């Protein structure tokens, strides 16, 4: 761990994993993996694709022989849409989308139950983003993996999510199904976010411009936020109780 949490708990399947350490933490990490935001910085430039994907297997002692590991690497490359002969190439020889496919293959190496996707498409060209999202959806359907998908692109969130949590300055303000959130948002911040999603039709966009919810006021400091609801200073629906809870 880099830092210990100062407050709160992290529960996974009802188990408190906030302060796990040693072998218990290592076992937990095997089941939960992470896809990083930047495919250019998250791959070791000195390692080949095969070495990058194989590394988690070596760390966690997966498979008994090198041949078994190599076969698994080839299988993972096929799953993410890359060729088996890419194993001997280095990250700089690939495009951003291909690098993110390599990252996804590495993430799948340990057969995790849960994957945290930390804005996995925000650093990619728009033309590639949909391909990566569809790849993630196909993998989820075939392997039954759960995702925690962190994103600010609400159109993509709608496309991939079953449940959506909306956060403002680190505080959960709304949690519901994807269908319910987009059809009937409850929190003023959620409504403002959804009203800001552009529509690729100038006429419709012009008509709905007057209905857009424009947030006013300054964003409070995350380290010195006001008492009560953190959104109160920018919310037109704020009441006295919002300053308390």
Label each PLM-derived region with a short phrase.
Residues 109-113:
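A short, proline-enriched helix->beta-strand linker immediately N-terminal to the Walker B motif
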Residues 90-94, 98:
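Conserved ABC ATPase signature
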Residues 177-245:
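Short catalytic/signature loops enriched in Gly
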Residues 15-16, 58, 67-85, 194-195:
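Conserved ABC ATPase "signature" region
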Residues 4, 17-33, 59, 180-185, ...:
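ABC ATPase NBD coupling module
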Residues 8-16:
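Conserved ABC transporter NBD signature motif
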Residues 116, 120-124, 128-207:
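P-loop NTP-binding/switch modules centered on Walker-like glycine-rich loops
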């Amino acid at each position: 761990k880099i830092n210990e949490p100062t407050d709160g708990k992290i529960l996974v399947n009802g188990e408190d994993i906030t302060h796990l350490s040693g072998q218990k933490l290592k076992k937990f990490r095997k089941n939960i993996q992470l896809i990083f935001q930047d495919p250019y910085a998250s791959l070791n430039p000195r390692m080949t694709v095969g070495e990058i994907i194989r590394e988690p297997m070596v760390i966690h002692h997966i498979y008994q022989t090198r041949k078994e590991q190599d076969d698994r690497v080839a299988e993972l490359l096929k799953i993410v849409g890359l060729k088996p002969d890419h194993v001997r190439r280095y990250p700089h020889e690939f495009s951003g989308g291909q690098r993110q496919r390599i990252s996804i293959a590495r993430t799948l190496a340990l057969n995790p139950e849960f994957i945290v996707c930390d804005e996995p498409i925000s650093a990619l060209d728009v033309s590639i983003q949909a391909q990566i999202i569809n790849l993630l959806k196909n993998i989820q359907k075939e392997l039954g993996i759960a995702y925690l998908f962190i994103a600010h692109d609400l159109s993509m969130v709608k496309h991939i999510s079953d449940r959506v949590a909306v956060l403002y300055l680190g505080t959960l303000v709304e949690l519901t199904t994807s269908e319910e959130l987009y059809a009937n948002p409850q929190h003023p911040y959620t409504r403002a976010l959804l009203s800001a999603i552009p529509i690729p039709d100038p006429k419709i966009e012009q008509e709905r411009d007057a209905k857009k919810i424009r947030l006013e006021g300054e964003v409070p400091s995350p380290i010195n936020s006001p008492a009560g609801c953190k959104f109160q200073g920018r919310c037109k629906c704020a009441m006295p109780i919002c300053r308390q809870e």
